[in-house]
Amino acid sequence: MKETPKQYIKRILGNLSGQHPLRVQAATPKKLERLVRKLTPSRMRRRPAKGKWSIAEILAHLADTELVGGYRVRTILSKNGTPIQAFDQDDWARDGQYARRDPKRSLATFRTLREANLALLKSLSAKKWSNYGMHAERGKETIRRVVEMFAGHDLNHLRQIEAQAKRKRG
């Protein structure tokens, strides 16, 4: 059974466990690089189970969602209260051919987008962090909440990649 938006929020925010979201986001690219540094592209394309994403697919997903996160923040900054469109990650994975993407290129794209997004976030006034958008599935989300969600999302996928990277061949 697919989780509800409320369950998703609770699970993703639960990953933070009191960690500062900007610090989590700043640390993620280096953690990803460390985890995949010694893995071959073919190893990164191996799915851990039917219906589960490979490391390569997760890296492509992270790159695309970083683009989404940056767009959401910029849209909210330019028009407080703006609608925020949801997206189906599985549709994006299939139609964006995540399984065929070069994992190293996905990681480089993620890193570049993350650096740009962090530079913007660090420049915001305290007041701007309260600007919000209306997410199509989750309702009102401030920039602060968007950043927390993306940091929790990072931690979720870091755990998945770490588990797959440690798994023996077979």
Model-assigned labels for residue ranges:
Residues 1-26:
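Extreme N-terminal tail/first-helix region
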Residues 2-11, 45-91, 115-119, 130-170:
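Short, contiguous alpha-helical
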Residues 11-18, 96-103, 139-143:
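A short, mixed-charge helix-start or loop-turn motif at secondary-structure junctions
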Residues 18-29, 52, 56-59, 103-107, ...:
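Amphipathic, non-membrane alpha-helical segments in soluble helical-bundle scaffolds
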Residues 23-35, 93-130, 150:
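Acidic/histidine-rich alpha-helical segments that form the ligand environment
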Residues 26-53:
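A glycine-rich, hydrophobic loop/mini-helix early in the fold
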Residues 35, 39-42, 80, 124-127, ...:
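A short secondary-structure junction motif
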